[in-house]
C-alpha cells in the first residue's frame, strides 16, 4: 500500500485565516498601507500571512523575524503554501539569497548596511514584521525608514508588550 505524504496535500486556510485574508483585502483596497494581525500564539499567523500573500498576489515579499531559527522555519511554512511557484531565500547566517522573490531574514541582519543596501527602497510589495510589538526598537526603525513597500503587515500575539529598546516612546 502506497503512503502519501501529508505535505503533498494542498493546504487551505482555516476559518481565522480566511477572515484575515478577507479583512486584509478590504484594508488594501481602501488604500491603507499598514495592517496588524493580532492573534494568539499557535493560531496560524505565519500561514495566514502566506495565504494572504498568495491570494492578494504579492510578488516580492520581505518577512522579518526576531531570530534566525524563525527565518528558516517561516520559509519552510511559506514553501508549503507556495510550492515552487515563487523563489524563496534566506539572508543572514551565511545565506545571501538576495534575489529571491520572497526573502526571510532577521531584523538584526537587515539592519546591517551590507545587507540593507542590497535593496532599493521599493524592492518589496509587502514587508511582514513578525513579533510587531518590537517595532519601536531602533533596529526595526532603521529598516522601516529604508523601505517603501505597498503594504507593511505586522503580526503579534502581544500588541501591548513593550520592547526593552523603546527609549521611552509610547
Q: What is the predicted role of each segment?
A:
Residues 93-126, 137-142:
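Conserved helix/coil segment N-terminal to the catalytic DExD/H
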Residues 63-64, 154:
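Structural beta-sheet core signal
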Residues 125, 133-170:
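Post-DEXD/H (motif II) to motif III coupling segment of the RecA-like Helicase ATP-binding lobe
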Residues 1-43, 47-60, 76, 80, ...:
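ATP-dependent helicase/translocase motor core
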Amino acid at each position: 500500500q502506497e503512503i502519501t505524504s501529508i505535505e503533498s496535500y494542498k493546504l487551505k486556510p482555516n476559518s481565522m485565516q480566511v477572515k484575515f485574508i478577507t479583512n486584509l483585502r478590504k484594508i488594501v483596497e481602501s488604500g491603507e498601507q499598514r495592517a496588524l494581525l493580532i492573534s494568539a500564539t499557535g493560531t496560524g499567523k505565519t500561514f495566514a500571512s502566506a495565504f494572504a500573500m498568495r491570494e492578494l498576489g504579492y510578488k516580492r515579499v520581505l518577512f522579518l523575524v526576531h531570530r534566525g531559527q524563525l527565518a528558516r522555519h517561516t520559509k519552510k511554512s511559506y514553501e508549503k503554501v507556495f510550492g515552487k511557484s515563487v523563489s524563496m531565500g534566506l539572508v543572514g547566517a551565511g545565506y545571501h539569497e538576495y534575489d529571491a522573490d520572497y526573502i526571510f531574514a532577521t531584523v538584526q541582519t537587515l539592519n546591517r548596511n551590507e545587507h540593507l543596501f542590497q535593496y532599493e527602497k521599493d524592492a518589496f510589495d509587502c514587508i511582514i514584521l513578525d513579533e510587531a510589538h518590537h517595532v519601536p526598537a531602533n533596529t526595526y526603525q532603521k529598516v522601516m525608514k529604508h523601505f517603501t513597500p505597498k503594504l507593511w503587515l505586522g503580526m503579534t500575539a502581544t500588541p501591548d508588550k513593550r520592547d526593552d529598546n523603546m527609549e521611552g516612546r509610547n
